[in-house]
């Protein structure tokens, strides 16, 4: 398996599809990275030369991906929570942040139902 950005990417897939297995790289960015590195999109990862892999690593180095991106997102959410703004409070309480209704639905964000207290 080829290792790019600390992730083992699948070797039997096309280069651009395999790049999407990296956190922070979607379809558009994966295609842009392949174009920037000069790698044909339809070439399988196992067919890539070491120079092409290095070119992909260099092109990918310009973006914030994997651990750095996860850390940045976590810090952004923590900053909102520390500020005490509306979005931060919603994060803190585990409720939907973007204005969705909560009287019904919102089960994904709120977690499983709590039943009645019993006797």
UniProtKB/Swiss-Prot annotation:
Organism domain of life: Bacteria
Gene Ontology cellular component annotations, sorted alphabetically: cytosol; small ribosomal subunit
GO process annotations (BP): translation
SUPFAM superfamilies attached to this UniProt entry: S13-like H2TH domain
Coiled-coil intervals, chain numbering: none
Molecular-function annotations in GO: rRNA binding; structural constituent of ribosome; tRNA binding
UniProt keyword list: Ribonucleoprotein, Ribosomal protein, RNA-binding, rRNA-binding, tRNA-binding
Region annotation Disordered: where it falls in the sequence: 94-119
UniProt record similarity statement: Belongs to the universal ribosomal protein uS13 family.
Summary of the function given for this chain in its UniProt record: Located at the top of the head of the 30S subunit, it contacts several helices of the 16S rRNA. In the 70S ribosome it contacts the 23S rRNA (bridge B1a) and protein L5 of the 50S subunit (bridge B1b), connecting the 2 subunits; these bridges are implicated in subunit movement. Contacts the tRNAs in the A and P-sites.
Subunit structure, as described in the record: Part of the 30S ribosomal subunit. Forms a loose heterodimer with protein S19. Forms two bridges to the 50S subunit in the 70S ribosome.
Protein's name in the database: Small ribosomal subunit protein uS13
């Amino acid at each position: 398996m080829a290792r790019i950005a600390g992730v083992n990417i699948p070797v039997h897939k096309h280069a651009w599809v395999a790049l999407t297995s990296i956190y922070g790289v979607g379809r558009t960015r994966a295609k842009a990275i392949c174009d920037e590195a000069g790698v044909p999109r339809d070439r399988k990862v196992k067919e890539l030369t070491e120079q092409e892999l290095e070119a992909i690593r260099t092109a990918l180095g310009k973006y914030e991906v994997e651990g750095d991106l996860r850390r940045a997102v976590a810090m952004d959410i923590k900053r909102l929570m520390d500020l005490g703004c509306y979005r931060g409070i919603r994060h803190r309480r585990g409720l939907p942040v973007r204005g969705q209704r909560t009287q019904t639905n919102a089960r994904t964000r709120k977690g499983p139902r709590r039943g009645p207290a019993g006797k």
